[in-house]
């Protein structure tokens, strides 16, 4: 690597490191009071389309004895902050399963269900449907990836706390190399409608495995077995 590129890479990582903090959210009474005002307005949306190509029916593929989407839904239910959980999908099977788990469902139109449609387009379609139906104010929108079964309640809550504590516009999960992994994205409303990542953002290291293939599933199973 060219020396100038190495310098740029170091500067880039230094910048990101300044945005990654271990925080004691509940110790800050002022911020906790601010959260209390937001509590009923934090929603989580899981986009889960049916047309996966590399791993058929990926979002319902069983890992650790349960359909993959079960795990992020289960962890969201444990969250100290998330009020409502939604699954948006073009698949009746996925929507029926999500409904059986006790979460709210949104029918995703076919024209935004192909593999070229950006994830945020599905998220924002869901947000608009929620606003139209419930006439409720939304303060924070959380995008949770269905094919990231390693997501934990602790990671979700840490991202929410990080956003509120530092008054970020959004917080994203990143891997150990500080690259965005897409597993968790927490956004203040209406920053979710921006096409690009906000300049006022923070990140939380999660290093979550993103499942796309059988090889990924096997790696996940091995890692779980070794724990």
PLM region spans:
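Conserved core of the sugar-phosphate nucleotidyltransferase
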Residues: 116-125, 138-140, 145-215, 222
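Intrinsic-disorder-associated, low-complexity terminal segments enriched in Asp/Asn/His/Tyr and depleted
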Residues: 2-5, 11-14
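N-terminal glycine-rich phosphate-binding loop and ensuing alpha1 helix
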Residues: 41-88
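Short beta-strand scaffold positions
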Residues: 88-89, 211
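Short phosphate-binding loop-to-helix
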Residues: 24, 86, 92-142, 151, ...
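Hydrophobic helical membrane-anchoring modules
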Residues: 7, 16-25, 36-38, 200-227
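N-terminal nucleotide-binding beta1-loop-alpha1 segment
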Residues: 20-56
């Amino acid at each position: 690597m060219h020396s100038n590129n190495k310098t740029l890479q170091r500067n880039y990582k230094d910048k990101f490191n300044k945005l990654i903090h271990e925080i004691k959210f509940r110790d800050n009474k002022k911020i906790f009071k601010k959260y209390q005002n937001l509590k009923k307005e934090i929603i989580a949306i899981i986009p889960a389309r049916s047309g996966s190509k590399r791993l058929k029916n990926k979002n319902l593929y069983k890992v650790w004895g349960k359909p993959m989407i079960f795990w992020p839904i289960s962890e969201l239910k444990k969250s100290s902050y998330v009020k409502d959980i939604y699954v948006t999908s073009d698949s009746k099977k996925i929507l029926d399963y999500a409904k059986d788990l006790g979460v709210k469902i949104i029918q995703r139109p076919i024209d935004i269900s192909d593999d070229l449609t950006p994830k945020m387009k599905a998220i924002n379609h869901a947000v608009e449907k929620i606003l139209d139906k419930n006439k409720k104010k939304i303060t924070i929108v959380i995008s949770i990836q269905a094919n990231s079964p390693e997501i934990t309640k602790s990671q979700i809550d840490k991202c929410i706390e990080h956003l509120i504590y530092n008054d970020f516009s959004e917080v994203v999960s990143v891997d150990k190399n500080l690259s965005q992994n897409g597993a968790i994205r927490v956004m203040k409303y209406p920053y979710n409608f921006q096409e690009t990542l906000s300049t006022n953002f923070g990140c939380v290291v999660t290093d979550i495995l993103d499942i796309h293939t059988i090889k990924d599933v096997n790696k996940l199973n091995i890692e779980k077995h070794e724990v």
